[in-house]
Amino acid sequence: MKIRNTILSLTALAGFTASGQMLDPAKLLQKPIDTWPTYNGDYSGQRFSQLKQINSGNVHGLSLAWVTRFGSGPGVTIKSTPLLVNGVLYFTAPNNVWAADAHNGRELWHYQYPPNTGSTIGNRGVGMYGNWLFFESPDSNLVSLDAKTGKERWKVQMTDPKLDYTSTVAPIVVGNHVILGIGGDHMDNPGFIESRDPETGNLQWKAYTTPRKGEPGLDTWPDEYASAHGTGQTWMPGTYDPQLNLYYVGTGNPNPVLAEQSRKGDNLYTCTILALDVNTGKKVWYYQVSPHEVHDWDASETPVLIDGVIDGKPRKLLAQASRNGYYFLLDRTNGEHLVTTPFIDTLNWAKGLNAKGQPIGDPAKFPRPDGVLVSPASNGATNWPAPSFDPETGLLYVGASKSYSMFYVTDTDDHPEGWAGLDASAGTQGAALEAIDYKTGKIVWQHEWPSGGGPSHMLSTAGKLLFTGNANNFIAFDPANGKILWHAGLTGPVTAGPITYELEGKQYLVLASADSLFAFTINQPVK
């Protein structure tokens, strides 16, 4: 296999020069057109493209351009948003990185990470700096590859292997910083965000997501031991404001996950949106969306950056539809709370909001030995699948789930560990694609999925189109009113965020489903 891949790489890449593979850093600061250079297309997290060659007037002519299967073993699922740089797609599955020709889907090279004991739940993709790619392995190594050949440049261990951390994050490259996150809350390990040098992999800074001794926030835990084992993992990439030089990232749930008796208090900085100085990792502000969270919901969903208008004044905003079922709108310069409102009507775990707009958890809905019925379910009202914001409609598009779980505590010890409980699905009132007014949190329209299902991935464009998927279709909606304009059948669900790009004058849409990439375009001449 290695010999075959090497020959394939050399043959397929003969027409590519090293300079041709280099990512122009300026592309990261622009709305994507002929590139998709970072996880969300640009730093804002909006997943909005200025392209409009494919538009509401001609989307009915969209057809399959190519499909390629990239299998590397049973059960492989591509959960990574592909990057597109200079005509090459880069994408991942756990332990695997591929490069493919964006014209036709032909594999250019395939890097396979050695067998390891890390979790293979998923991998969100690569980051890129110049000619180099970066991805996190399941056993928490940062690996750097040559983008032209797929050859490994170096790898560095991010954590002590004995601690059994896991890694799923797509690195985000900001200047000369490769910003990383971590997973593994089941092992009681402290969460962190860190930055490494793209040249060497050396650590530049590390910001823990639970407070150390002498740090602010420790008083929200019973003691230093509880905080040190409180996790707050950072398993999704964040967003970035280049004017403020702030990186925004959501943190995971506290630990023990379902048993709260050993961690009384708000448990900072779990289930929190953090704003970090990119140069130092210093916490500039924070907002906790779920104080003292007890249902395995996190705040890891994309913090979407919006330059909007509130009460007639321009504001730099941050919007998040969070896993706990609430929509939050903040001032991203200082964390000031502006809006909190539920985006599912089955939500039953909170008694109301406090003065800061934070939900007040109802102790009657905490997990207990005989179980308690709660909505949203353990997977949340939404989850990691990417939302999208269309600045032309002013709507945030989110996949929403109106489901229930029974939550149980199974470890009533004074100091439980790990999950310390279990949850079981307890039915659903359906799932929907929701269009949320960013200013108010009001649901402007929604499309109920007839077969139920859960949140899917979003992409909006200046062509007055919104793309997403359900259990086995790729679908285009009118973003203003939710009318279905086009759809194509797939062999399964959309498993990663769709992207769009222009290549040699033609616009393409690319999406992942299971172990394959599908590309769509309009093959007849575009008027």
Question: What kind of region is each of these model predictions?
Answer:
Residues 21-73, 106-115, 151-160, 202-210, ...:
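Aromatic (tryptophan-biased) beta-strands that constitute blades/sheets of beta-rich domains
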Residues 36-40, 75-95, 118-142, 166-190, ...:
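Repeat-blade elements of multi-bladed beta-propeller folds
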Residues 45-159, 461:
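N-terminal cofactor/phosphate-binding cores enriched in small/glycine residues
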Residues 101, 146, 197, 277, ...:
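Structural recognition of the beta-propeller blade-terminating site
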Residues 191-202, 266-281, 334-335, 431-438:
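Beta-propeller blade signature
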Residues 292-294, 299-302, 342-348, 377, ...:
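Conserved blade-ending motifs and adjacent loop-strand segments that build the rim/top face
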Residues 401-402, 425-483:
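Loop/turn-rich, solvent-exposed surfaces of beta-rich toroidal or solenoidal domains
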